[in-house]
Amino acid sequence: MKKITTFKQKFIDTHGRERIFNGVNLCDKGYNGEEERIYEMPFNEELIKKLSQNGFNLVRLGMTWDAIEPEPFKYNEEYLDKVEKVADLCEKYGIYFYLDMHQDLYAGFKGMDGDGAPKWACLTDGAKFQKTRFVWAEGYFWGKATQRAFDNFWNNAEYNGIPLQTYFCKMWQHVAERFKDHPALFGFDMFNEPFPGTDGGKVFRKLVGSVVKTVLTDKRCNLVWMAKQVLTGNAIRALEPFNDPDLFRKVTSAGNGLIYKFDVGAYSQFINRTARAIRNVTDNGIMIMENSYYSNLGIPYSAPVINYDGVREEKVCFAPHAYDLMVDTPAYKYASNSRVGSIFDQHRKSQQRLDVPVIVGEWGGQSEGTDWLFHINFLLDKFDKNHWSQTYWAYYDGLLENPIMSSLNRTTPVAICGDIVEYTTDRENGIFTLEFEQDKDYDVPSEVFIHKAFASIECTADYELEAVDGTEASILKINGKPGNNKVTVKF
């Protein structure tokens, strides 16, 4: 497999082709056993093969600190063997992987929601983790144990006389040592959705106050109408005023100051420290920066690009996340394209500031039926417009038979010689188009994944087709010439 690196806002391979990745999350958060959390990395060859056949060429391979280092400096090699087995399967079927150190609510123990850190690394200053009562994320909002555990992690408090982040960095070095030369390695996603700790609780309270103030004072909010919707059982409709991106940003801006402080302070210091630790082991792999939990709502991400004493990391990308407020509920059919679109517009501004490529690390979610797929298609079109790669959240048993696959299994550019100008999908008329500017002659073709049988191909250059075994899909290989090249696939 070709090594992937970065150039400005593009992913490129060793031939200099622009690469686009259509991916999915495979995340092992573990589950509660009788005494301890159990981790299995339960992704087999049949699954990886099917992912490849469905056009997925990247997986975000999620694991946790707890799974890897259950005791200080004692690493679970048996578990890492399981991770490596999945990585080997990815290579076999032409799929890249990047390693995600996942967490939700900092950690999770018996009977508790959450995942991430081992119990010994949870320094809560005496606060106790509480069971969830309403929504899984409430520990972020008012859970003192979760908030204090994050505070102590970001402040690099000591356990047994050693700073927590020293343990974390050495754990990452151990992982990097094992995977540094793997042919399918894409990169290192060092920390999932970093949360600011006690300041995160303050942000939540500021956002609640901002909602109340906006509803009471902004003329765009008809309080009588909104109250009527709630009283008549249409509470979801009461949120419609916040489909207005300007109004939504007005509410979320209440948290801007505290998130800026976190991004440029504790998080930036942490990500630089962790990336440097990995780079002391290997120059391979792309360093992946994530936004904080609250930037999933569109609060600006302000961390500078990863650097070492002012020297910029050469291989780095930005991996933003965002979801609609209705995600993973029966009300997902009421998802707001304009609201989530504005969040990704803010992420686009962050990309331009950082001048790095983007892979949307998490997006999408799930619901019942098909009347929410308009939102999935909207997001895919937005990513395509920005030439963004993405990893859908997340794989579960039955995903590949779910109606959402009519959106996720799609025709996409894979490796393009030169610069992509534009690629679009017209779902109504069944037309995919690609335009690219080839800067020189290449000794390899441009490649496009065609997801099913097609009616015709129009191309300004010679091309060949390579069948994808066991499917109606094919790889379109275009022998482009310097200058403008166009492709149209009709279904």
State the predicted function of each range.
Residues 462-473:
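Solvent-exposed beta-strand/loop surfaces of large extracellular or lumenal domains
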Residues 48-53, 179-180, 304-314, 348-355, ...:
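Acidic (Asp/Glu)-rich catalytic clusters
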Residues 372-459:
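Extended, alpha-helix-rich binding/interface surfaces that flank or overlap catalytic cores
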Residues 226-254, 305-336:
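Aromatic- and acid-rich polysaccharide-binding/catalytic face
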Residues 476-491:
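Surface-exposed interaction regions enriched in Ser/Thr/Asp/Glu
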Residues 315-323, 329, 340-407:
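Substrate-binding cleft of secreted/luminal carbohydrate-active enzymes
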Residues 6-9, 42-48, 293-309, 340-348, ...:
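Alpha-helical scaffolding within the catalytic cores
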Residues 6-22, 26-285, 291-295:
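Active-site mouth of glycoside hydrolases
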